[in-house]
Every structure is written in C-alpha cells, then in structure tokens.
C-alpha cells in the first residue's frame, strides 16, 4: 500500500512524505492510448480510448491528462487508469443496450479481469469518475436501493451507483473512495437530477463527492485547459 519516502518539502526536509497509489475508474475523460487499454500486467483489453486521437482535442500526450498530472504530485503515484470510453455505471448503454457482465459497465470492473489481474490493482485511493454516459444516454435514475439489488435495479443509475460504491468499499477495504461528478448544470456535464443522486448516494456510503465546475470542453470532452482544471479541483480535495 502507501510508501513513506523522504520529504520534498523545503520548509521541513526531514518530514516524511507518504506516497499513495491512485486508481482511476472512469470513462472517455480518463482514457489515453497505451495506458487505459492495458491492465496492471500489461495485458491488452478491449477498452475504447478517446484520447489522443487526431482532431479530438489538444490533449495530445498523456502528461496532459488530468489523472497523469495529479499523479505527478509528490504524494501520489498512478496505480492504473481503469477507464473505458463510453462506459456507463449502470448496465444500460446508449439506445437501451444491455451491457451486463461487460467492461462497458463500471460495476463489472471491480475485482479480477479475465486474465486474473485486478482491474484496479492495489490502490490507496480510488477516484470514481462516472455517470456522464448514463446521463447522456438517458438511463432511468430508478430508486435509491442500498442492498439486495435485482437485475432490473442495476439497469437504472441510482441502484447501480450504489452497488458500485458498496462493491469498491467491500473489495478494497484499505482504499479511500472518492467520487468525481461532471458538473451539475446539464450538457456537457450531468443534469441536476443526476448530480443530486450522486451526491445523495455518496453521503449514504460516506464517500467524498467532488463536483467539478467550469471545465473547458470541445464536443463534450475536456481540453488540456479543462484537464488542468479537473486536476486542480480534485487535488484541492484529495491532496488535503
């Protein structure tokens, strides 16, 4: 888990610095070719990747992604970006497609993959950045359900997000889980109802929820400036 190194603090060079391993559970916002489409052991997966494909945005190198910048801070190191472009928290994709049991569902990406490698590694921190595609695909919110989830429940967002957080806390008991919400004003973020749902579910599980503001985007996706803003806003919370 976390490692203790010599301090990088010029005001107190003898103070120890604890380096925490960070895993990202995300969608297109957290992808990058050659990073998010391989697992912890380097095995290729079938994840879709948004960045840095030509013409998407000016995020043309991995060091321009929010998560890479965050993990360059002295107190963090990247465990893995377990991120699949287009993925949904629930088991319902665009046009009502059922993605139960596939890596297009966040819920499936907990524990071991088909190679026997843990999707999220051995993290100290897990940053869950999802819900955008559920909202854009108009997945039904459903009811607040905190146990005994049915297949029908998990095709709706609220029960699925609840199960995701519960599963992460159970499977990675030594990790701290945070949620990142893509705004609360609608496209190119999530709607107020989605944002409120995420916040309510986070409160139930004692998960800190980071609601992003003023993220520069092109075609609904963060630019380099947007990535910098995400990094800064997330660091303000997890870097405390």
Question: Language-model segments: which ranges?
Answer:
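Bacterial Sec-dependent N-terminal signal peptides
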Residues: 3-18
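Residues at the starts of beta-strands that form the adenosine-phosphate
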Residues: 21, 78, 174-176
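Acidic-leg catalytic submotif of subtilisin-like serine proteases
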Residues: 21-33
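Catalytic nucleophile serine of serine hydrolases
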Residues: 28, 41-44
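Short N-terminal helix/helix-N-cap motif within the alpha/beta-hydrolase-1
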Residues: 33-34, 137
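Conserved SGNH/GDSL esterase-like catalytic core that processes O-acyl groups on lipids
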Residues: 44-142, 221
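Alpha-helical cap/lid subdomain in secreted, periplasmic
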Residues: 101-240
């Amino acid at each position: 888990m976390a490692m203790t190194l010599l301090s990088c603090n010029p005001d107190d060079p003898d103070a120890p610095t604890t380096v925490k391993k960070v895993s990202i559970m995300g969608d297109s916002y957290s992808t990058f070719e050659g990073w998010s489409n391989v697992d912890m052991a380097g095995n290729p997966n079938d994840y879709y990747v948004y960045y840095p494909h030509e013409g998407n945005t000016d995020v043309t190198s991995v060091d321009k992604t929010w998560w890479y910048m965050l993990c360059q801070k002295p107190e963090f190191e990247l465990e893995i970006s377990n991120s699949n472009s287009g993925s949904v928290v629930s088991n319902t994709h665009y046009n009502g497609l059922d993605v139960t049991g596939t890596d297009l569902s966040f819920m499936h990406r907990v524990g071991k993959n088909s190679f026997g490698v843990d999707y999220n590694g051995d993290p100290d921190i897990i940053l869950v950045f999802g819900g955008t595609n559920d909202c854009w695909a108009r997945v039904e919110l459903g009811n607040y359900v905190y146990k005994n989830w049915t297949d029908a429940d998990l095709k709706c967002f609220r029960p699925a997000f609840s199960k995701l957080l519960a599963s992460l806390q159970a499977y990675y008991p030594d990790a701290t889980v945070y949620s990142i919400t893509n705004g609360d004003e609608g496209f190119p973020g999530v709607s107020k109802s989605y944002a409120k749902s995420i916040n309510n579910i986070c409160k139930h599980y004692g998960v800190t929820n980071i609601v992003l503001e003023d993220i520069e985007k092109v075609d609904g996706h963060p630019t380099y400036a947007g990535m910098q803003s995400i990094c800064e806003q997330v660091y303000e919370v997890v870097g405390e």
